Every structure is written in C-alpha cells, then in structure tokens.
C-alpha cells in the first residue's frame, strides 16, 4: 500500500503550539475552546498574543514530545512495515539532524520517500540530502509516479472502474508560473496533484489541486 502525509514538523515549537500541544492543561483547554467555539485563526491569534503578553516563547509553552509521539503513533497505526510512505515536505524544523533521524527511525515503515519542503534543511542546499539518505529511499523537490486510481463519473463520484494516472507530488501546489516546468504543469490540470502545504497567497489556485492526500 502507498500512503502520503505532510508537514510533520518534528521539533518545531510554533507549529506544535498552534496544533494545540501545550504543556499547561488550563492553557490548552482555553486554546482548544477558542478553536472550537470560534475559529482556528482566532485560536492562533490568541496564543500568539498570550506569548507576547507574557513575554514567553512557543518553545516554553509547547509539548514537543507529545506532538511527535502522536504523529508517529498515528502513522504506525495505519502504515505497515512493507508499505510505502511519502512525506510531502516540512519534515522538521528548529531541531538537530539527529533528532529528526530519531523520529524517522521510530516510523515502522522501510520504504520512506521525502518531497522537500520550505522548512527542510535541504530546501535551498540540496547537498544536505546526504543527511537523510540512510532513511529515505528517494529525496526530491518534485516527483511524478503512476498509480492505478478510481475513475470518477460526471458528478465526481467514484466508480468501480480504475485507470492508470500520473501523480505529481510537491510541497506546494505546482501551479505557480515559476519557470518552464511549473507553467507546463499549470496547463495540465487533469493530472492528479498531491501537495503538502497550502499557503494563503495561493488562494486563487485552490480549485485546481487535490490537497493533502491519504492512501492508495
């Protein structure tokens, strides 16, 4: 089986806190209440204001270990040892290479693949690919693979028929006009896209991408 995930953000205090993994029970409860009764954006704004007003840091209030344990446990609950797992970027941030490798080795899957994200050490320096070569079978900023996928009917519902389709994978939706390759991709919207991060400045492109993926 082939699985996809993204934005694990191992070791990243800001993302850990914004996802609600806070080391103070009262603070966590209040944060989650704002998230549920208002919006995620309101909760994010509230916790950022809390850090500012109390002159503290996201590192001081977040629970990185619980965040990482939850991600790894969730992956291991679904992905098998002989399966294939694609991580579509933002593997880790603000932590050592050794810590990142330790997290990866706790994932019970022997076929790991990395699509590089903007927070990854090898985003600008591809020389750093060598840091992760022992755990990943492939490392790239963009990759296409062929997969057998269900055929959709005219209403968009899944049918019993399947067809071989090309899957384009990147950390961002590859519809930006940055260079020849992405312009070519923008002209081929029928291709199935898998991407990890969806940033606000890409709002106009949203209808043309498939979003975070699950399993196939």
What residues fall within each predicted segment?
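Extreme N-terminal starter segment of soluble prokaryotic enzymes
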Residues: 1-3
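Conserved beta-sheet core of the metallophosphoesterase superfamily
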Residues: 113, 130-157, 161-216
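Core catalytic region of metal-dependent phosphoesterases/phosphodiesterases
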Residues: 5, 10, 14-147
